[in-house]
Amino acid sequence: MAKLSQDDLLAQFEEMTLIELSEFVKAFEEKFDVTAAAAVAVAGPAGVGAAPEAAEEQDEFDVILTGAGDKKIQVIKVVRELTSLGLKEAKDLVDGAPKPVLEKVAKEAADKAAESLKAAGAAVEVK
């Protein structure tokens, strides 16, 4: 079998439907035992002349799930929405609380995630 170049692969992917791509990603994850979870938030580059005083004000936060509460299934659903984890991974995260759900995200994203988790019945900490 001839080796396909990156351009050839991209051309093939362009012809696929979203459902076909989704099935491909699932098969790829199973074959190579990896996950294709997207990064939840990306921090912007730090300023070149960032002053040490800026360290006083925290701009990256972690959302820690401290407990699932009574509505564990709802919490698992919210964790999956926030992280793009699979069902098993999200369940393991919820069962293994306290665990970080999101790390190094902006204050707004951390607050929104914490609010969603609390609405589902989880106990959450933002650090």
Swiss-Prot record:
GO biological process: translation
Keyword field: Ribonucleoprotein, Ribosomal protein
Matches recorded under InterPro entries: Ribosomal_bL12, Ribosomal_bL12_C, Ribosomal_bL12_C/ClpS-like, Ribosomal_bL12_oligo, Ribosomal_bL12_oligo_N_sf
Signal sequence, start to end: none
Disulphide bridges, residue numbers: none
Gene Ontology molecular function: mRNA binding; structural constituent of ribosome
Cellular component per GO, a single term: cytosolic large ribosomal subunit
Top-level taxon: Bacteria
Complexes and interactors: Homodimer. Part of the ribosomal stalk of the 50S ribosomal subunit. Forms a multimeric L10(L12)X complex, where L10 forms an elongated spine to which 2 to 4 L12 dimers bind in a sequential fashion. Binds GTP-bound translation factors.
Protein purpose: Forms part of the ribosomal stalk which helps the ribosome interact with GTP-bound translation factors. Is thus essential for accurate translation.
HAMAP family: Ribosomal_bL12 (MF_00368)
Family label: Belongs to the bacterial ribosomal protein bL12 family.
Protein name in the entry: Large ribosomal subunit protein bL12
UniProt organism field: Streptomyces virginiae
Lineage, top ranks: Bacteria, Bacillati, Actinomycetota, Actinomycetes, Kitasatosporales
Protein's gene: rplL
